[in-house]
Amino acid sequence: MPHMLYTEIPTQRPVTPLLDAIDHPQQLRQLEHSQLLQVADELRQYILYAAGQSGGHFGANLGVVELTVALHYCFNTPNDRLVWDVGHQAYPHKILTGRREQITTIRAKNGLAAFPAREESVFDTFGVGHSSTAISAGLGMSLARRYQKDPCEVVCIVGDGAMTAGMAFEAMNDAVAHDADLIVVLNDNDMSISCSTGGFAKHLAAIWEKGHLVNVNEHGEAYIQPHPKWTYNSRLHQSATDAADNLFKAIGFDYFGPFDGHDVTQLVQVFNVLKKRKGPRLVHVYTKKGKGFAPAEADPITYHAIGKINAASGGKTPPKYSDVFGEWLCDEAAQDERLLAITPAMCEGSGMVKFAKQFPQRFFDVAIAEQHAVTLAAGMACEGLKPVVAIYSTFLQRGYDQLIHDVALQNLDVTFGIDRAGLVGEDGPTHAGAYDYAYMRTVPNMVIMAPKDENECRQMLHTAYAYNGPAAVRYPRGAGVGVEIQKEMTVLELGKAEIVAEIKANSDEQITVLAFGSRVMVALEAAEQFAQKHDVSVCVVNMRFVKPLDEQMIRDLAEHTHLFVTVEEHAIMGGAGSAVNEFMAQEQIVKPIINLGLPDSFLHQATHNQMLQDCGLDAKGILNSIERAWLKVNQVV
């Protein structure tokens, strides 16, 4: 039965008789080998349908259908552990482990998580979302089961993009040191989100081009049939390459492959052989991102993720903040040849495609290597250049030591464009940018800005670039508020806030709202409603800078303020509001103050607006919080 190639995403649920009978992998394991091809085809059809209903990660899931079927067929899950790296390719896994009918709720409020989550299923052995953690976690499980004298098979499924991170090799090195019983499946599709880059990607390509196969015949096992690409090769009774030519063997792993990751029959043979071996083993499988859906095979970057196919397109939307960043980057680079741009494998997501094409010699995609990205920038700055690092807030966490030790400690001139700051909606807690104020504002020499709109974002990026030292601009996911973006760039006064509204009332009482970043315009809306409803004056301030704060403005406003309110799309603990609290305490400014922001909990996925409502950070929620606080200030019961 050949692989089916689909050209459209179905709007009606496909007929999937074999798949419908699988609510547990044990039922899959009761099928004949010959039925697995049909299971894989039904699974691929169902993923096409489900992704169209819910949106979400797409190409990676289509690419691991046969691999997932083979893994659950050969290994005794959940007792045997499957550890998925990153997890955006886990939809087939979720469908085969009792969540078939729920898969259309993925990424929705109260629905399935976008990634494997331990609280969701016993089959989700490790919670993921960030890259390159699977081998470390899997090694920990293997060593724990060895210690408990209850061994099991632990299989880590890792993409070639994830293997570019140092953590993966740290874990492999340690696995060899412990002679751990661990299987690493290298899912090689030459992609992370963008195309894989660097020496490791070239190494994998070299292995592939040699066309050698592993003949797992050392103990009389059946010969593994070759991938069609290699039918001209005779049988080989040796490993893919000599140890000197194979990085994995040089580290100390037994290496098998590369195999066709879409040949489910061969994969079953391979995994059944490997179960009989011990020690650290690596299976190299070659897959195609978007397999089985023609548009995704042709354009895997665009089809990394998709939206709901029936979602209303609406009218024209403002530019995304990532696009504002990308336009600024090109404009700034045209004026200053010292500008170099760095991204850790997020060229498209960070809005850098245009820059990469326009200035290819000044663009550095370092793969999934956030620590390296930050220190690479530090080294460039040491030579008098002005590097700009484009990075998601949640991923900068991985380079925190480098931010402190390699950049800030030396007061190096590095600009950080921090994307996806705040809540990120359907991607859930693993991708939320909830902590960057807290982890950056404690670092000496750092300047931190947050724009109220897309035009101010452009001006802040220019300001950060002009500043001679480490500076960060953090901006949210998605579109701006719709203001006109000025082509001319101006440098903002460092640490200077902006009063956006002074709403006067008949009473002498005043509330001051200190708003940061994405919450400024929403706080203004709430303030206007409060002033009109309660006849109380309200001053709304766009703070602009988290560090340095506009301390003088706070002092001046405190003389007339009866209640301070801080508002931010960031964790309350350690955030911008905490910085205001600390300053007021040091200055002995004794005024009532409330801090509005994200609670001390990990927030599960929903739409961005739903999450803001749940946190009380929409206009209605901010208004309600101000009203409650004002009642307390006036001791009204």
Curated annotation (Swiss-Prot):
Cofactor note: Binds 1 Mg(2+) ion per subunit. Binds 1 thiamine pyrophosphate per subunit.
Assigned EC number: 2.2.1.7
Coiled-coil stretches noted in the UniProt entry, renumbered to this chain: none
Alphabetical list of SUPFAM superfamilies matching this protein: Thiamin diphosphate-binding fold (THDP-binding), TK C-terminal domain-like
Pfam families recorded: DXP_synthase_N, Transket_pyr, Transketolase_C
N-terminal signal peptide: none
Record flagged with keyword Repeat: no
GO cellular component, one term: cytosol
Presence of keyword Metal-binding: yes
Catalysed reactions listed for this entry: D-glyceraldehyde 3-phosphate + pyruvate + H(+) = 1-deoxy-D-xylulose 5-phosphate + CO2
PROSITE patterns referenced in this protein's UniProt entry, alphabetically: TRANSKETOLASE_2
Residues annotated to bind Mg(2+): 160, 189
Record protein name field: 1-deoxy-D-xylulose-5-phosphate synthase
Gene field: dxs
